[in-house]
Curated annotation (Swiss-Prot):
Keywords assigned by UniProt, alphabetized: Ribonucleoprotein, Ribosomal protein, RNA-binding, rRNA-binding
Pfam families to which the protein is assigned, alphabetical: Ribosomal_L27A
Protein name: Large ribosomal subunit protein uL15
Gene Ontology cellular-component terms listed: cytosolic large ribosomal subunit
Record InterPro entries: Ribosomal_uL15, Ribosomal_uL15/eL18, Ribosomal_uL15/eL18_sf, Ribosomal_uL15_bac-type, Ribosomal_uL15_CS
UniProt record similarity statement: Belongs to the universal ribosomal protein uL15 family.
Native source species: Nocardia farcinica (strain IFM 10152)
Purpose of the protein: Binds to the 23S rRNA.
Subunit annotation: Part of the 50S ribosomal subunit.
Biased composition (Basic and acidic residues): 15-28
GO biological process: translation
HAMAP family reported in the protein's UniProt record: Ribosomal_uL15 (MF_01341)
Record region (Disordered): 1-42
Length: 147
C-alpha cells in the first residue's frame, strides 16, 4: 500500500493538549504552578521587571547624535568593477548596471574611484567622485552626472 498525504498522522505524544491550570486540586489546581505567596503568585509583574535590580533599559546609555531624515542613499559601483563588467567598453548607465547585476533598479547610483580602468566607457550616473572622473577620462571615456 502506498503512503498518501491523508494517511499521515502525528507521532504518538507529539501533540498534547494545553494544561488548564487552577481548575481543581487534581489537575494543577490551587497555586497553578505559581508557587506560594509573593507578587508573582498574586498578580502580573511587568515583562521588563528584573526583581529590583537596575533594569537593562536604564543601564544602557541613551543614543547620542542624530539621524538625518533627508539623507540620500546611493548604490555604489567602483571603476574597477565597471572595467570587469564591461571589458569592451561602451555605454554604461543605470539600465546596463542593473542588467549586469551591479546595482538594484530604481535606486540612485554613485561611481567611486577604486580600481583601475583601461577601456573607454561613457558613464552616466547620479553622482561620480573626482577620482573616478579622472580615471575614466584618462582611459578615453566620458562622464555624465545626472544629479
Amino acid at each position: 500500500m502506498t503512503i498518501k498525504l491523508h494517511h499521515l498522522r502525528p507521532a504518538p505524544g507529539a501533540k498534547t493538549d494545553k494544561t488548564r491550570v487552577g481548575r481543581g486540586e487534581g489537575s494543577k489546581g490551587k497555586t497553578a504552578g505559581r508557587g506560594t505567596k509573593g507578587t508573582k503568585a498574586r498578580k502580573n509583574v511587568p515583562a521588563a521587571f528584573e526583581g529590583g535590580q537596575m533594569p537593562i533599559h536604564m543601564r544602557l546609555p541613551k543614543l547620542k547624535g542624530f539621524t538625518n531624515k533627508f539623507r540620500t542613499e546611493y548604490q555604489v559601483v567602483n571603476v574597477g568593477r565597471i572595467a570587469e563588467l564591461f571589458p569592451q567598453g561602451g555605454t554604461v548607465g543605470k539600465a546596463e548596471l542593473v542588467a549586469a547585476g551591479a546595482v538594484r533598479k530604481n535606486q540612485l547610483v554613485k561611481v567611486l574611484g577604486d580600481g583601475e580602468i583601461g577601456v573607454a566607457v561613457q558613464v552616466t550616473a547620479d553622482k561620480v567622485t573626482g577620482s573616478a572622473k579622472e580615471k575614466i577620462t584618462a582611459a578615453g571615456g566620458t562622464v555624465t552626472e545626472l544629479a
